[in-house]
UniProtKB/Swiss-Prot annotation:
It is found in: Cytoplasm, Nucleoid. Its main location: cytoplasm. GO terms for cellular component: bacterial nucleoid; cytoplasm. This is Nucleoid-associated protein HP_0035. Keywords: Cytoplasm, DNA-binding. Binds to DNA and alters its conformation. May be involved in regulation of gene expression, nucleoid organization and DNA protection. SUPFAM superfamilies: YbaB-like. Homodimer. Belongs to the YbaB/EbfC family. The lineage of its organism: Bacteria, Pseudomonadati, Campylobacterota, Epsilonproteobacteria, Campylobacterales. Pfam families: YbaB_DNA_bd (PF02575). The keyword Cytoplasm applies.
Length: 97
């Protein structure tokens, strides 16, 4: 590889990363717990965009806390897994050059 091309290559990767981040923002990851009594949705940037709690849980604070923690943790894991996949794909594209 010609090192004089490295700057252009890095600029290209930066642009590709920005495009992937923008596209990723529109990706939604939904996790449920308690048999669907709690549902959380995150966009690809890790921002919580929706939270649904079944009305029957409003009387059972402890169960609601457990289900919320479970759904949130699963949602965060899905977002992180997606980020890893994007990073590996970018590195794979870089290796091809």
């Amino acid at each position: 590889m010609d090192f004089s091309q490295l700057g252009g290559l890095l600029d290209g990767m930066k642009k590709e990363f920005s495009q992937l981040e923008e596209k990723n923002k529109d990706t939604i990851h939904t996790s449920k717990s308690g048999g669907g009594m709690v549902s959380v949705s995150f966009n690809g940037l890790g921002e919580l965009v929706d939270l649904q709690i079944d009305d029957s849980l409003l009387e059972d604070k402890e169960a609601m806390q457990i289900y919320l923690m479970s759904a949130l943790n699963d949602g965060y894991k899905a977002v992180e897994e997606n980020r890893k996949n994007l990073a590996f794909n970018m590195l794979g594209n870089f290796a091809k050059l």
